C-alpha cells in the first residue's frame, strides 16, 4: 500500500471512495474539487491536503482517481495548457471513473502517454453505499499492464472487477449498462402505477413480480421507494439523460 492516492472530484461517489481507501490503509495524499469547500471538508476529515490546483494533486500522488461529471470536465482536468493533471505527470497512473464518451477515454490515454503517464478506465456500476463499503462493480479498460499495476488498489474498492479490453471498451459496456438501467425503472414505475390505479395491493404485486419474469434488479433496489413514493434523488435525471446520450451516440 505504498501508493499515494489523489482524488479529483469528491462528490458523493469520489468522497466515499477516498474514505474507503483511507480505511484500508492507503495514503490519500490530496483531494481536489471544483467546489473548494467540498475538498476542504473532506481533507479535514481524512487529514490530507485540499489541493488548490490540479497540478498539485499530480505532484503529491502516485495514482490519481478522477470522478468528474462529463466529457467537458475530463477535457478541463486533462488540458494541454494551464492548470492540468498532466503537469509533471511522468510515472503517474490515472484511473478515470466518470461515465463519459469512449472516445474521450481514448484521447485521455494518448495525452497521458505523451506526458509519460498511464491511464485506465474505471467505469463503475454501483452507487454511493457501495463506494463507501468497497463493493463497487468495476469495468476496466486500457493497457493490461497498467491494470495489473493498480489491481490491488482496485480490489479494495470493488467486490467484482473485470478488465474489458483496450481504452474505450469499458466505457462502451458502461454506456450499455446505464442504457438498460435507465429503461428498467420506467417499466417498473408504469407497472406499479397501473397496479395502484387498479386498487391492487402493491406489496402483493411486488412479491409476484419478484417470482416471475417481471423481476429485476430495479425491483430489488427501487421497488419499495416507488411503492412509498419516496423521491429522494440518488441519481439525477440529468445524469441519466447524459448517459443515455452516450449510448445513443454509439449507434
Listing of model-derived features with the role each one plays in the protein:
Residues 215-251:
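Interdomain hinge/lid region at the active-site interface
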Residues 54-118:
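Rossmann-fold NAD(P) dinucleotide-binding segment
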Residues 17-21, 108, 153, 194:
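Hydrophobic residues within alpha-helices
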Residues 99-182:
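Rossmann-fold dinucleotide-binding core
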Residues 200-212:
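Small-residue-rich helix-loop
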Residues 1-67, 92-93, 97, 163:
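NAD(P)+-binding Rossmann beta1-loop-alpha1 motif at the extreme N-terminus of oxidoreductases
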